[in-house]
């Protein structure tokens, strides 16, 4: 398994024969790649946590270019269908549900404490034969993260730390205690001034109270398991 960060909340998770592109706002100011370059990498699926501009991003254009199915809440898949994605190219689901993508890869949709233009915000647990990844989406800290950690043996947690619109470093460090992942990658910070944070502060907080290893990635970096 490998996980590539494009800045903000955009990642490509590669496991088995699949390439899962998550929240592809790859035109963000930190991204090392253009939407065209990301499409050329041929993602097999596009997962969207909610429909705010910085998460929906270029998902429609990339889906049109690649034919990759779009995974999201029912309301979100209706929204991308209105933008020209065929209904047959969408995979609607809802919080608490699981879908199988093939090659032993399953996606479980988690709740997120946030807002959305349509439908509910969410996160994803991606369980694969090579490891399990939790992408929290945009969220505040919530106690049921402990249940997510009990349900899934999380190898990597991708957590927002920007504050203002999501939890900040202090709350995200508590989230790590609840989730009990082996590794943590901070996201959704320093893309613009309102969410400026020091990821090293988050790293110090987490590693002082848990056994999790924090990886402070730079946009374009790849984490291999």
Swiss-Prot record:
Pfam families noted in UniProt: Lactamase_B_2
Gene3D superfamilies assigned: Ribonuclease Z/Hydroxyacylglutathione hydrolase-like
Keyword Zinc in annotation: no
Entry's Gene Ontology molecular function annotations: hydrolase activity
Keywords for this protein: Hydrolase
Membrane-crossing residue ranges in chain numbering: none
Family statement drawn from the similarity comment of this UniProt entry: Belongs to the UPF0173 family.
PANTHER family: UPF0173 METAL-DEPENDENT HYDROLASE MJ1163 (PTHR43546:SF3), UPF0173 METAL-DEPENDENT HYDROLASE MJ1163-RELATED (PTHR43546)
Protein name: UPF0173 metal-dependent hydrolase Pcal_1074
Natural source organism: Pyrobaculum calidifontis (strain DSM 21063 / JCM 11548 / VA1)
């Amino acid at each position: 398994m490998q996980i590539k960060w494009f800045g903000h909340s955009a990642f490509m998770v590669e496991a088995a024969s699949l390439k899962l592109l998550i929240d592809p706002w790859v035109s963000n100011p930190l991204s090392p790649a253009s939407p065209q370059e990301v499409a050329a990498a041929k993602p097999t699926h596009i997962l969207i946590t909610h429909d705010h501009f910085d998460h929906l991003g270029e998902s429609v254009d990339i889906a049109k270019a690649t034919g990759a199915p779009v995974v999201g809440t029912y309301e979100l898949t209706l929204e991308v269908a209105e933008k020209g994605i065929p209904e047959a190219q969408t995979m609607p689901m809802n919080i608490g549900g699981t879908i199988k993508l093939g090659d032993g890869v399953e996606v479980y949709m988690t709740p997120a404490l946030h807002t959305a233009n349509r439908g509910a915000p969410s996160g994803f647990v991606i369980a694969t034969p090579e490891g399990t990844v939790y992408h929290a989406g945009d969220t505040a800290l919530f106690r049921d993260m402990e249940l997510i950690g009990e349900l899934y043996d999380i190898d990597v947690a991708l957590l927002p730390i920007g504050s203002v619109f999501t939890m900040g470093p202090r709350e995200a460090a508590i989230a790590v205690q609840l989730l009990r992942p082996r590794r943590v990658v901070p996201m959704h910070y320093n893309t613009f001034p309102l969410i400026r944070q020091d990821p090293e502060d988050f790293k110090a907080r987490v590693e002082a109270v848990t056994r999790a290893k924090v990886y402070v990635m730079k946009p374009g970096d790849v984490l291999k398991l």
